């Protein structure tokens, strides 16, 4: 979905839940697209290996695949703008049959299609939900400071079109 719907916020909450709760995955990896292979390498133990940092992309992919092939993992990818060949980076897609998961956020349905990903659409909030979120973002004393403010605030919340990011900013 378009920007401001809360895709990144949702993915961060998923990541935080994995960090603070018991789960049945061997490793949870949050990776930025720009440094995807290095981020994966860090999470599986290659961060201190100076030799690994100097390896080619293909050699890193072999190393990543050798570690992840024996693990049940969750790979969280935020803000994907174009399709990524994860196998080329060393991500063993056959593990998805054994319960590993890859979750990505994107603004492009086409990226989901090209990566054969199941789509979960996020949409704007209904007015009641948007108004509730807006009220949580401002002090109650501000709303109560003048009789015209609640009406103006509700109009402003409506103008945000139910986009969580717009309501928070």
Residue ranges and their predicted role:
Residues 22-23, 66-70, 93-98, 113-114:
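Conserved catalytic network of the ASCE P-loop NTPase/AAA+ motor domain
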Residues 31-94, 143-148:
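Central P-loop NTPase core of STAND/AAA+ ATPases
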Residues 40-55, 98-100, 108-169:
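Non-catalytic, charged helical/coil tracts that couple and regulate nucleotide-powered enzyme cores
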Residues 20-35:
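Conserved catalytic segments around the Walker B and adjacent sensor/switch elements
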Residues 76-79, 99-107:
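Structural recognition of the conserved hydrophobic beta-strand(s) that form the central parallel beta-sheet
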């Amino acid at each position: 979905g378009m920007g401001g719907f809360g895709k990144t916020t949702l993915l961060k909450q998923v990541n935080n839940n994995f960090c603070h709760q018991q789960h049945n995955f061997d490793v949870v990896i949050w990776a930025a697209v720009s440094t995807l292979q290095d981020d994966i390498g860090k999470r599986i133990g290659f961060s201190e290996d100076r030799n690994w940092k100097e390896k080619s992309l293909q050699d890193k992919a072999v190393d990543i695949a050798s570690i992840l092939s024996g693990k049940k993992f969750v790979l969280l990818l935020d803000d994907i703008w174009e399709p990524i060949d994860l196998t080329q980076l060393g991500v063993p897609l056959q593990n998805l049959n054994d319960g590993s998961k890859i979750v990505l956020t994107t603004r492009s349905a086409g990226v989901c299609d090209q990566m054969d990903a199941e789509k979960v659409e996020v949409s704007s909030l209904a007015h009641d939900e948007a108004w509730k979120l807006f009220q949580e973002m401002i002090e109650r004393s501000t709303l109560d400071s003048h009789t015209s403010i609640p009406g103006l605030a509700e109009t402003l919340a409506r103008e945000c079109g139910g986009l969580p990011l717009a309501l928070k900013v």
